[in-house]
Amino acid sequence: CHNVIKQTNYQITNDETFRNRANLYLAQDKEKREPYSGETKVMHYFELLRDVVGFDKIKEKVVNPLTGRKIAAYYGCLLLRPGKVMAFDDPENPAIMEEFIRAIGAEPVIYPYRNECCGGYVALEDPDSAKKKSNAVTNSAESHGAELAVTACPLCKYNLVHNGSNIPVVYFTELLAEALGVKEDTNA
């Protein structure tokens, strides 16, 4: 999970005690492992698409624009929080997924529950609570005109789909592949 990796890297970089404990743990696998100090930049795929590839470049490469499709971006609670650590969009008023939706030719739907929790890992202990949270998200998206929802978190997708969403929920790479004209490999 991007959230766990990024938070761990942040702690290794900023907390000497944590860094020492992590390096002791890692050294168990290999005697001569170099200590890790957090020098790797952890990026989400959306950061890569926006900051390295560029949404303008993606827009240029679209061969199958998703024109007329109303898509609700679902951020959930793990993609952008804690904001100080994730630090690639505003956790209270995010825009990166809406920019992506526009780049592939669709219309983003703004709705109140787009950065609320879907139930996350709570689904393991309290499925009813996760179902209630997930349904609040998809019902909100649908009532604001969305015909489908897109997410960047596999756990969010699982919760939204398996808790009875009335609208389809897809992973963002599915929309990207569709817009770029990538054919599904049925032999994979």
Which residues fall in each region the model found?
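Iron-sulfur cluster-binding electron-transfer modules in prokaryotic oxidoreductases
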Residues: C1-A188
